[in-house]
Amino acid sequence: MPSSISWGLLLLAGLSCLATGCLIEDSEKSDAPKHDQENSASHKIAPNLAEFAFSLYRVLAHESNTTNIFFSPVSIATALGSLSLGTKADTHTQIMEGVGFNLTEISEAEIHQGFQHLLQNLNKSNSQLQLTTGNGLFIDHNMKLLDKFLEDIKNLYHSEAFSTDFTNTEEAKKQINTYVEKGTQGKIVDLVKDLDRDSGLALVNYIFFKGTLEKPFKADHTMEQDFHVDEATTVRVPMMNRLGMFDLHYCPTLSSMVLKMKYLGDITAIFIMPKVGRMEYVEETLTKEFLDKLLKKDYTGKNTVHFPKLSISGTIDLKPVLTRLGITKVFSHEADLSGITEDAPLRVSQALHKAVLTIDEKGTEAERHTVKGPMALTLAPEVKFNRPFLVTLYDRSTKSPLFVGRVVNPTLH
């Protein structure tokens, strides 16, 4: 290596596409036997991932109360988990504790087995939805990585390793961006904007989800309506609407309307719309335990729901965020990544995460079920998601929050 200190990049990408029409041909329930969920290894780490998700969210929310937020805690935790395999001493401890693991309560073997099982479940074949995760390790072509690290990340985190010439920064960027673009089916492009020629490795993680509502909205009923960003700002957005059975209720504890919508497969989307002026309170109140309560209870009834079509995305610089969670050593000259390579000192210089959320009514099923003409008049309660709300995409099979976010302005992409 040309320098005494080699730099590493931790790059993450996530995509969630929630289409309210049918995106796949076979919508029948899978007959494949399921694992014993109660004894699943992934369930042992699920509470930690949920707490990590809300800890991350609160750090991001404190940075600004006027911006959209969207990220994949599973993607970020998976990348940190795989990176921890090559860390030692305080660098290692900080990552474990930063993600929320107490090593006196759960062993490292159980943690990595939990991630392994989580990834196996998320990547299993399912005709009802598209859910894919990927891990790529781009290694300087002159650097020799330890065999144990390569073996562990491959077996536990399904990582692929690629030889990369970082001195040719343009070609290296192209190689990494092509990997992410392909893995997210072209939805996330140009994740890497800048790359240092002294980089030693880039750890890239992505998650791609494309789901279909069990009960889709109808495209013909979408119309322009007001969305109240704040007391002084109103924007016009295409608002989907449907009369039907919805799991919807008002939660006094959160001062919020809570809407749960199931997607084909094992995904549930939870939307929480606080009363005006109560967003910050909800952000501080929402915990893993409260999320569990919301998921367990069913409030299905006949309602008319108006929900905005939207597509939001954003790139998060994770370095200051993770630093707030106590993960500092890995970014400093004191980093101990000697479990990755012994060729030269190594540290993570950059940690980027990009996630995209799309909610619309595209799809063949929505088109097939579209009824031309105006909606019938009804006395059913009407709820409009026309002000800022929170969103969580939850995988029921692994009990893990795949995505967490806040929609303040649906028109900001």
From Swiss-Prot:
Origin organism lineage: Eukaryota, Metazoa, Chordata, Craniata, Vertebrata
Comment field on protein domains: The reactive center loop (RCL) extends out from the body of the protein and directs binding to the target protease. The protease cleaves the serpin at the reactive site within the RCL, establishing a covalent linkage between the serpin reactive site and the active site of the protease. The resulting inactive serpin-protease complex is highly stable.
Record InterPro entries: Serpin_CS, Serpin_dom, Serpin_fam, Serpin_sf, Serpin_sf_1, Serpin_sf_2
Keywords, comma-separated and alphabetical: Glycoprotein, Protease inhibitor, Secreted, Serine protease inhibitor, Signal
Stretch forming the signal peptide: 1-21
Residue positions with a glycan: N65, N102, N123
GO molecular function, one term: serine-type endopeptidase inhibitor activity
Organism, as annotated: Ictidomys tridecemlineatus (Thirteen-lined ground squirrel)
Superkingdom of origin: Eukaryota
Chain spans, region RCL: 368-387
Protein family: Belongs to the serpin family.
One GO term describing the cellular component: extracellular space
Name of this chain's protein: Alpha-1-antitrypsin-like protein GS55-LT
Reactive bond (site feature) positions: L377, T378
Function according to Swiss-Prot or TrEMBL: Inhibitor of serine proteases.
Subcellular location as annotated: Secreted
